Amino acid sequence: VLKARDFSADDFARSHPGGALGRRLLVYARDVMHTGDALPLVTHTTSLLDALAEMSAKRLGMIGIIDDDGLLCGIYTDGDLRRSLNQGVDVNRCEVGSVMVQKPHTIPATTLAAEVVELMQRHSINGVFVVDADGRPAGALNALDLIRAGVF
């Protein structure tokens, strides 16, 4: 019937934006990402203990690490903390830059939320930072944000 009426999945999504297909094709990272003061960000020279406090306060399960130019240069997650503790890292004497994951997966704000789900599943990650064209953090989102949006 869709073919006979020349009605595409995109047309259906626009006609039914609240439905599952509509959410998959019409919700973008920019629609669900945390921005501004809600972004968990520290510099690479921040102590791991202070970085953990910021990560806990922002409640995304991750923290972005920026360099001196404000570019995202790394990420540190709840899982990274567990691995650090297992390796005997002293959170009181360590800078987050020495234990961060360099070159994290990032996305532009125009990425469809459904594509973010695929990226997260493919790389077994729970969150991702949104960056602008220059590589500066513009937002962040995690799996719970996608579930709340009805995309996951």
Task: Outline where the language-model segments fall.
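Short alpha-helical segments enriched in small residues
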Residues: 83, 88-102, 109-114
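Internal, active-site/partner-interface "lid" segment
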Residues: 3-34
